[in-house]
Amino acid sequence: MAVKDFMTKRVVYVSPETTVAAAADIMRDKGLRRLPVIEHDKLVGLITEGTMAEASPSKATSLSIYEMNYLLNKTKVGDIMIKNVLTVSKYASLEDAIYIMLQNKVGVLPVVDNDQISGIITDKDVFRAFLEISG
């Protein structure tokens, strides 16, 4: 069983110039926890709920809500994204993808073919595959 058989093919993504606030809106509206960052049709990074939380001002900040919103609307995804993203080929076995995810404690692997993203495989996709295989 190959990654291509279980990956999500319709990938929602953002560009490095997208604001953190806009990326957060997309993630909330689509029910996603992470987004690949694409520039000139190439994967350049990944933004997650965790990276956005780390970039957000502390709840104990003295900034007003308006100042926090201003910061989130000025900060670009490219400034806070994970740049060294683990990827997998669509021809890799599902077992190899699971191994990479477990070894590196990640819940997502962009599926890259010839430097272009062709899908994404997440922990949820792996669970669905398990259910499908086990009957």
Q: Where in this protein do the model-derived segments appear?
A:
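A glycine-centered beta-loop-beta connector
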Residues: M27, L35-T51, M101, L109-D125
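The conserved cystathionine-beta-synthase
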Residues: V14-G31, V37-E39, M81, T87-K105, ...
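Tandem CBS (Bateman) regulatory domains
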Residues: M1-R10, T48-V85, I98-L102, T122-G135
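Short N-terminal signal/transit or membrane-insertion segments
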Residues: T8-E17, L43
